[in-house]
Regions:
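N-terminal, motif-rich segments that launch catalysis or mediate targeting to/interaction with membranes
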Residues: 1-74, 78, 96-171, 186, ...
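Short alpha-helix carrying the canonical HExxH Zn2+-binding catalytic motif
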Residues: 76-88
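Transmembrane alpha-helices
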Residues: 173-226
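Transmembrane alpha-helix/helix-exit interface in multi-pass inner-membrane proteins
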Residues: 88-95
Length: 234
């Protein structure tokens, strides 16, 4: 997106939600275009491409950091603005389609961004995004995002998710009270495969370990409870 569009969406969302230091957030929403960020892949530092799935991971990382800073009474404007930048950029598809074929096109990308800069921010998208204030719902919505090709859909998606991110950081629902029950059930579930080793002998230990790890990864209730707990813990 053009800087004009980033700032337009970010300012509209921050004003609608009465966010403090809103202009600092607005200015930070263009930082990723000024300062490259990197992730590590196969031992190498690779620049985060704003229209790749790594942009969503970068956005989520900044969202988590912004929430922590807010809980600690510190300024979260920079991380919040950078998160919104990645969310907004990823909503723009950079591909062209013809029949069943699809390919990346810089020309299409540039044309879409030029035209987006002339669109108004959809107020109904802000209202829709404000309905999401649960961190687990935000995470699901964020990582379910798909790049859009139609201009109105791009603007709507970018605005909705931007509003959801801001609302969840500043006005979250929940309190993390289900954490203790979730962790108790999780420990019991992860430990249960060890019964194989106790009953069948130590030769079963490797399989029991693998099963325990699988149970840990697939215990979605535990991971949701953990995110909610962490959301309210400085």
């Amino acid at each position: 997106m053009k800087w004009k569009t980033h700032k337009l969406i970010t300012r509209a969302v921050c004003e609608a939600l009465s966010i403090p230091n809103s202009e600092e957030v607005v200015e930070s929403s263009v930082f990723p275009d000024q300062h490259n960020e990197f992730f590590v892949s196969n031992g190498k530092r690779v620049r985060i491409k704003h229209h790749s799935p790594f942009a969503l991971k970068a956005a989520w990382r900044h969202i988590l950091k912004a929430r922590k800073l807010l809980l600690q009474g510190k300024d979260c404007s920079e991380d919040l603005g950078m998160a919104l930048h990645y969310i907004q950029d990823y909503s723009v598809s950079v591909t062209r389609r013809f029949l069943f074929f699809r390919w990346r096109s810089e020309k299409v990308h540039d044309e879409r961004e030029e035209e987006l800069a002339e669109l108004p921010v959809p107020r109904d998208a802000i209202e829709e995004g404000m309905k999401i204030r649960d961190p687990n719902q935000l995470k699901k919505a964020l990582f379910s995002e798909k790049p859009e090709e139609e201009l109105e859909r791009i603007m709507y998606t970018a605005t909705t998710l931007s509003a959801a991110a801001v609302a969840t950081i500043f006005y979250p629902v929940g309190d993390g009270s289900g954490w203790r029950r979730a962790v108790a059930l999780h420990i019991a579930a992860v430990a249960s495969p060890l019964l194989l080793a106790l009953i069948g002998g130590w030769l079963w230990l490797p399989l029991a370990t693998v099963l325990g790890y699988a149970v840990h990864k697939l215990d979605f209730k535990y991971h949701r409870a953990k995110l909610e707990r962490d959301w309210f813990r400085p």
